[in-house]
Amino acid sequence: MGLLLYKQQTGAFLSNSVKERLEASLERWGSAQLIVPSSDTVLLVKRQLGAIQELSVGVNVSTFDEWMRDQWKLYGSSDRLLSNTLRKVFFQQILDGMSADELGTLTTSKGTVELLSKLAPEYLSELDQIVVSGQLSAGQMSACKVLERYKMLLEEKSYVEVCQCLDYLLQSTPEQGPALVFSRVEDLSEARLKFVRKLSQKRDVVFSLYVPEGPAGYAAERQLELVGGPGCACRVDTGLAPAAKSQELNDLLARVFRAKEGNEVTPSGAVTFLSPLGQHVEVESISRYISQCAESGCKSFAVYTSDSQRVWDALSQKLAAKGIAAHYRRSVRIQDSLAGRAFASLIDAYATLSERAELEKNIDYQASDHQMGDMSWWPPRTLTDYLISPISGISVERAWMLDKSWRGNRTLYATRVLETLSKAAMSSRLCAETIKSLELGRIGSAAQRIIEYLSAETSDEQAEVVQSKELTLQSLQNQESLKVMNKIVSSAQELHEAGLKLTPQTLKSFIELCKDQAVMMPVSNGIQSDIQVLIAPVRQAHSFEPHSFDAVIFQGMDTLNFGVKASDGALQEFVRHASKTPKVSEFARYQRDFYTALITASTSVAFEKVEQKDVFNAVALSEVKACYPKDYAKKTGVARGEEEVLVNLLPQATDPERVAELPTIESGEIDPKLKNIVVLPRHLTRETLEQELQGLIEVSREGLPLLSASQIETYLECPYKWFTQRRIK
C-alpha cells in the first residue's frame, strides 16, 4: 500500500516505471489496472501490451470514468450513477419549481443549469462545509439552496453524484488488491485527485506523468503536488526522452518558452512559417506544404486546429484532389444532424398539434358560426421538414403532396393532420408507428422504431458497399442518423428509469435538452493512400506519444484561434470559496498542451497564420519565433498572395496554373473517386440527381429540383442555412 509518484520524460504510455509496476502487480495479484487519458489511448496501449509477452495477459486498460463505473458495479450500493443528461433535467426541474424569492439573483436559464451541473459532481458531498464557511454572496447562497434540494432529490430517487460515488468506494473497496497505475492522465478533477490520494492508503497507486523540462512541465509538476501533497517526493523515470529525426526540431523543443538571446535555433528547413496573405489561400498554403513534405518522404501528418470542422470542410477535398487520405473524428451535435433536426421538428409539430387538437374538442363543427381560434400553427412547416427527411419513411413525392394539400386548406384542423399521420396508408408505416408511440408518451419507443428502419436500410447499403468497395454519402448519413437516434433512446430510457413521464407539454423540453448532446463520427475523404492526414484539436495530442507523426501543422496561430483559454468567472469564484486546494493555471495548461502537440512531430513542423490587420500572433507562435534570429520568420516564411489567382485554389484542381481570374464554371470531368464527396455537380442526369438528393428534395421529369412552399419559405429566411442543413454546398 502506498502512493508512488513518477516524473517521466519519454512521453510513452508504457514507460519503464509503468511497466515495472504493472509487472509487480501481476506477479503478486495476477492482475493490474492501467488508467490512460482517453478511449483512443486505450486501443493504442492494448496493442502495445499485446506485443509485450510479460504484460499481454492480466492488465486491464481503461479511462478513469470507465474504471469508476466498473468499480461501482462491484462495490457500490443499489443507487445508480447519475448521467449528465439526467443531472440537467433534475436541476431544470428544481429551478422551475422555485419561487422568485427563493431564486434571489439566480435565473432559470440554461447558463444557470450549466453552472450547477459543473458544481454538483465535484462539491455536492462538501455542501455543508461550504455553507458554514459564511463567505458566500447572496447569489452563491441561492445556488447552495438549489444544490441542497438537488441532493435531497437524488436521495429520493436513489441516485449518486460522482463525488458521492468516490466517497462510497473509498469505504467499500477491499483493503488489498491489484495496483492502480495512472499513465499520463492530466487534469483530473479535485474530487478524483482526493480519491486517488486516499485510495493509496488501501492499495498500491502509481501516478506517472510526462514532465518535460522547462515551463512546459509546470502543469504536470503542479498536478503531482496536488496528488501527493506539498513537498511530496517524486521519483524520476530512468527512460530517456526520444529524439526527433531533425536536429532543428530537437533544438526548438529544448528552447521553446525559455528562449534566450544569443542561443537561437540554427535553421535547417525542418520548421516552416506559413503566412498566407488572406483566408482564400490559407488552405492552399497548407495543402501545398503537405504535398511538398510527402514528396520528401513524409507519410503521416497531423493538422492541429481550434476549428476542426471548418478546416475539414476546406482541406479534405483539396487533399483528395491530390490523392492524399484525410481523417477526422467529427463531433456531431444532435441539432446539427439531419436525423436530429428532423426528429426535433416532429416533436415540435406534434406538441403544437396535440395541444391544438385538445382545444378543437370543444369546437362545434356543425355550427355555421363556429370560430377556428388561433391559427398561428398553420401551415405546419416543421412537420414538413420531418416528412421530407429520411426518418419519416415517406417518399418525397408523398411529403410534397401532403404539404401542398395542407397549405391549400385554410380551415385545416390539427385533429385531421394527426389522423393523416397516424394512418399508414396515408403516410407510411414508420410514420404511423412513430406518432402512436408519441401519443403514449413513449419517445424512446418512437426513436427505436426509426432505428430499426434505418438499421434495415443500412444493412442493405453495406451489402452494396461490399460489392462496390465505396462508402456512399447516403450510407454515411444513415450511420450518423443511427448514432443520433440511439443517443435519444438512451436519454429517454434514463428519464423513464428516473420515473419522469413525458407528456406533450414536456416533450419540447426533453428534445431541447437532447439537442446539445453530441455523438462522435469518424469520417474520411474516401481516398486510399499510404499518405495519411489527421485533422484534430490540440487537446487530442494527449492521446499520442512523441514523434507519432512525420510532420505536424499548427493551423490558425493567432490570438483568436490559439489563445489562452479563459475560465468561467462565476464557476471560478464559487470554486474559490468551495475549495482551498490550489489549481493549475490556464497558462501552464496552454504551455503543456502546445508542447505535447509539438513533440508529436518527428521530421518537420509548420506554423500557419493568415497575415491580416489587427490579428496578432498567438503566445505559442511568438515563443517559437523568439527561438530564431530576429525577423527570421518574415525573411524565410512562405507567403501565398491573392493578387495572382491560382486555379488550384479550387478543391478539384491540381496544377498551379496562373490565371487572371477564377473560372466561373468547372471544366473537364470529375474523377470518379471524388464523386462521393461532390454533393451537387453541375452536369447530372435525372437519375443521378435523384440519387444524390434522395430524401432531400423532389426532382422533376426535366431533372430540375422541385421545392414545396414550406421549403421555399425556409429558403427565403436564410438561403445559406437552408443549403447547409441539407448538406448542399
Question: What residues fall within each predicted segment?
Answer:
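Conserved motor-region signature of P-loop NTPase helicases/translocases
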Residues: 1-48, 55-58, 175-176, 181, ...
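Conserved helicase core region in the C-terminal RecA-like lobe
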Residues: 38, 60-66, 179-187, 307, ...
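ATPase/helicase motor core of nucleic-acid motors
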Residues: 52-60, 66-76, 262, 291-302, ...
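C-terminal, charged and often intrinsically disordered regions of DNA end-processing helicases
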Residues: 292, 625-729
